[in-house]
Regions:
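Short acidic/glycine- and proline-prone juxtamembrane loop motifs at membrane-interface regions
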Residues: 162-168
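Extracytoplasmic loop-helix module adjacent to an early transmembrane segment
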Residues: 41-91
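Alpha-helical transmembrane segments and terminal signal-anchor/GPI-anchor hydrophobic tails
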Residues: 205-335
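Transmembrane alpha-helix segments characteristic
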Residues: 2, 49, 341-361
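Transmembrane-helix motifs of polytopic, lipid-linked glycan transferases
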Residues: 29-35, 122-143, 328-333
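Short hydrophobic/aromatic helix or loop-helix immediately within or flanking a transmembrane segment
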Residues: 71-117, 297-298, 302-303
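Membrane-interface transmembrane helices that cradle and orient dolichyl/undecaprenyl
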Residues: 138-145, 176-188
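Transmembrane-helix signature of polytopic, membrane-embedded enzymes
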Residues: 41-45, 135-156
Length: 397
């Protein structure tokens, strides 16, 4: 078979690169125009999504170097290998084993029927497809299509979905999980939760806690059940304190090691193994009280970073402004029709704060955790938007 002789060719920013990706753009453009002709979407959505579908062509190589997000090449190569040979790349399989995040991401993104998967940007168009399908699914819950569309024009969503990364899959799965959980579709919610166990274990943990709180504790019903859940969480935390601290300390040290720079210029884990051993003890959390105290101290920084004194390019102030606006939007949704008094919204926000607090504890590299913050925050923002909808049953109580 010809696929036995598959080798990866990096087309870079050549003419062939743009021809391949224009074909992928054209396929998605045809799909959105077809839906417009069927009157399934309005003219604003047509124009917006055509622009959104075009962004991968102007992000990689044109605006920023794809090597700034080097993971793209790993996912793209794995997808190409799976399609060409039916097997994983040797380095991926030997390094991560079977059923790893890279292979799993490549398999899911690879199911999108695009004309080709020839370059590092091809998977970005698969991400765009999943985002668009999510928009179509959500649209039926809202009377105002244009208002929903605005949430899909958030710059970070456009940016991260314009690259061959797993962030978009995590956002889509988390968002669909949250909406189905709010709608009491527990089995369907569990189906969308399961892939996160491989794609993003931290996100799985946060949302699984939400699942338990709602299904077993019924914490979204009233003050007493919510309080019972919080007390249960505190008691369970102290019972499993050693195990929880072991996991938190492992991740704190791992993130610190990943971003470590030694005095001789060496970086990451190799440098940490040589020079960073003495810093590990300072990073370790001694108790859950210590963890809570440090999380509270770091939480404001986590929500508003990157901070002005760390701005090194034009994207940093834009990301900071976006983070402030998204927080404002979430608060405004909470104030809408006194939603902040509703225990469905209170539970949703409580889980968001738990996830944010844990990330604030683990935070090391700002660039990495700006991505993590958006991946966590955006699904909860859409969940709040769904709850604030005037047609939602919770607002009628």
């Amino acid at each position: 078979m010809v696929n036995e002789y598959f080798t990866l060719h990096n087309y870079g920013g050549t003419l062939e690169y743009y021809l391949f990706e224009l074909a992928n753009f054209s396929a998605l453009a045809f799909f959105v125009v077809f839906l417009y002709k069927l009157n399934y979407i309005n003219s604003n959505s047509l124009l917006a999504w055509l622009a959104i579908f075009f962004t991968p062509l102007i992000i990689n190589y044109f605006i920023i170097s794809p090597y700034l997000f080097g993971d793209q090449f790993q996912y793209a190569r794995e997808a190409m290998s799976l399609k060409a040979t039916g097997g994983s790349i040797e380095t991926v399989e030997s390094r991560f084993g079977t059923g790893n995040t890279v292979t799993y991401t490549a398999k899911i993104l690879g199911v999108v029927p695009l004309p080709n998967y020839m370059t590092v940007t091809s998977l970005a168009f698969a991400n765009k497809f999943f985002i668009f399908v999510t928009f179509l699914w959500l649209k039926r819950f809202f009377s105002n299509e244009n208002e929903l569309l605005l949430y899909f024009l958030i710059p970070s969503l456009i940016l991260y979905s314009s690259m061959s990364l797993r962030d978009t899959l995590i956002i889509v799965l988390s968002l669909v999980f949250i909406i189905n959980l709010i709608r009491d579709r527990y089995v369907l919610a569990a189906v969308f939760l399961y892939p996160l166990l491989v794609l993003k274990i931290q996100m799985f943990a946060f949302l699984f806690l939400y699942f338990i709180a709602r299904l077993f504790f019924r914490a979204h019903k009233n003050y007493y059940l919510f309080t019972f859940f919080v007390l249960g969480l505190i008691i369970g935390g102290f019972i499993m304190q050693e195990q929880i601290l072991a996991v938190l300390n492992l991740y704190r040290i791992a993130f610190a090691a990943e971003n470590f720079v030694a005095f001789d210029g060496s970086i990451s884990y190799h440098a940490w193994n040589e020079y960073g051993g003495g810093l590990a003890e300072a990073l370790e959390l001694s108790s859950l009280g210590d963890a809570l105290f440090k999380a509270i101290l770091n939480l404001p920084n986590f929500f508003i970073m990157p901070l002005p004194w760390n701005w090194s390019n034009i994207f940093y102030p834009l990301q900071a402004l976006e983070s402030w606006l998204l927080i404002y939007l979430y608060v405004r949704l909470g104030m809408k029709q006194n939603l902040y008094k509703n225990y469905e919204f209170i539970l949703l926000t409580f889980i968001l704060l738990i996830g944010s607090s844990i990330y604030a504890l683990l935070m090391s590299n700002e660039g990495t955790f700006v991505r993590y913050r958006f991946t966590l925050f955006y699904p909860f923002l859409l969940g709040a938007f769904y709850l604030s909808s005037t047609s939602h049953k919770f607002l009628k109580k």
